[in-house]
């Protein structure tokens, strides 16, 4: 029996709808409009597409969008000065620096210059530490989106065995922390994991975030398991460029109970959760009640 397809595009639209409702309430009840500042350094084509999409969706939910486009040769001092100004701007509740940065800029230094309360990407070392110790933090958008989809599909995740394939600071590690927070038994697997297939076969939940096209075949999947595919890989097949995930979709979908497609699965949730994080940051800054269902 084929797996249930978890429609990330439809789920993201629901999240954006909830965010828009809360933004309208903030405007009407408190005269506050959440603001998201996005900083783009250079002219990387993919980054430009992402920034345009983020700006468009920010405005669509009723927030203010502030785009700062800097030349590729912008100095670190000038970039840090901009971040300092945004940190002090009361109309800006979220700050996102689009990655990757040009090679002469220190990404860690730049990210950690952002006020942790405005770090809507959840990459600041303070937010990493807060998440790791189970405290209130800004949570990275992609893992947050994965968690939302898992909760929506399963309800409670308590007691489930979860395997996260990938140990990046952006997805793998925070994903594991979030699953631990929901009382899963979590294994982080990676390129050095022995008998990776056997490890994955024990999982009720598989989150693939390793960046290798179609690495996970269907015979690695426990029957009925839920598969969350974070990977976005471009491959050449039959003379055409295709987007595929980190799991082999066709074979995994024959075994899994539920699966996210690529495209249309995790991807749309990332920007939706960025908007949710900006709303959360705004409510916290103004000491207002946080909206339900948009934070872990």
From Swiss-Prot:
Key words of the record: Amino-acid biosynthesis, Histidine biosynthesis, Hydrolase, Methionine biosynthesis, Multifunctional enzyme, NADP, One-carbon metabolism, Oxidoreductase, Purine biosynthesis
Sequence positions that bind NADP(+): 166-168, 191, 232
Domain of life, source organism: Bacteria
GO molecular function: methenyltetrahydrofolate cyclohydrolase activity; methylenetetrahydrofolate dehydrogenase (NADP+) activity
Catalytic activity: (6R)-5,10-methylene-5,6,7,8-tetrahydrofolate + NADP(+) = (6R)-5,10-methenyltetrahydrofolate + NADPH; (6R)-5,10-methenyltetrahydrofolate + H2O = (6R)-10-formyltetrahydrofolate + H(+)
Record-listed E.C. numbers: 1.5.1.5, 3.5.4.9
One Pfam family recorded for the sequence: THF_DHG_CYH
Family matches, as SUPFAM superfamilies: Aminoacid dehydrogenase-like, N-terminal domain, NAD(P)-binding Rossmann-fold domains
Presence of the UniProt keyword Transferase in the record: no
Example GO biological process: L-histidine biosynthetic process
PANTHER family in the record: C-1-TETRAHYDROFOLATE SYNTHASE, CYTOPLASMIC, C-1-TETRAHYDROFOLATE SYNTHASE, CYTOPLASMIC-RELATED
Family indicated by similarity: Belongs to the tetrahydrofolate dehydrogenase/cyclohydrolase family.
Protein name from the UniProt record: Bifunctional protein FolD 1/3
């Amino acid at each position: 029996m084929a797996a249930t397809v978890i429609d990330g595009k439809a789920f993201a639209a629901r999240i954006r709808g909830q965010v828009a409702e809360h933004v309208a309430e903030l405007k009407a009840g408190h005269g506050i409009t959440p603001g998201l500042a996005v900083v783009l350094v250079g002219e990387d084509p993919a980054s430009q597409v992402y920034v345009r999409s983020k700006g468009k969706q920010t405005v669509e939910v009723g927030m203010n969008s502030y785009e700062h486009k800097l030349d590729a040769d912008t100095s670190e001092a000038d970039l840090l000065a901009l971040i300092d100004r945004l940190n002090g701007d009361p109309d800006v509740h979220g700050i996102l620096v689009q990655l990757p940065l040009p090679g002469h800029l220190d990404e860690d230094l730049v990210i950690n210059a952002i006020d942790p309360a405005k770090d809507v990407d959840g990459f600041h070392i303070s937010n990493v530490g807060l998440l790791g110790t189970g405290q209130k933090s800004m949570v990275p958008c992609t893992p947050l989106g994965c968690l939302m989809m898992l909760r929506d599909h399963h309800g409670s995740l308590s007691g489930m065995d979860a395997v996260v394939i990938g140990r990046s600071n952006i997805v793998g590690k925070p994903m594991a922390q979030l699953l631990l927070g929901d009382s899963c038994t979590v294994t982080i697997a990676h390129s050095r994991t022995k008998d990776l297939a056997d490890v994955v076969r024990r999982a009720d939940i598989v989150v693939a975030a390793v960046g290798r096209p179609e690495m996970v075949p269907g015979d690695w999947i426990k029957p009925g398991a839920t598969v969350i595919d974070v990977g976005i890989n471009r491959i050449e097949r039959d003379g055409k460029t295709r987007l595929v995930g980190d799991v082999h979709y066709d074979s995994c979908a024959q075994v899994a109970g539920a699966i996210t497609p690529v495209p249309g699965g995790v991807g749309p949730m990332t920007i939706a959760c960025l908007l949710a994080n900006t709303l959360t940051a705004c409510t916290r800054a103004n000491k207002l009640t946080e909206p339900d269902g948009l934070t872990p």
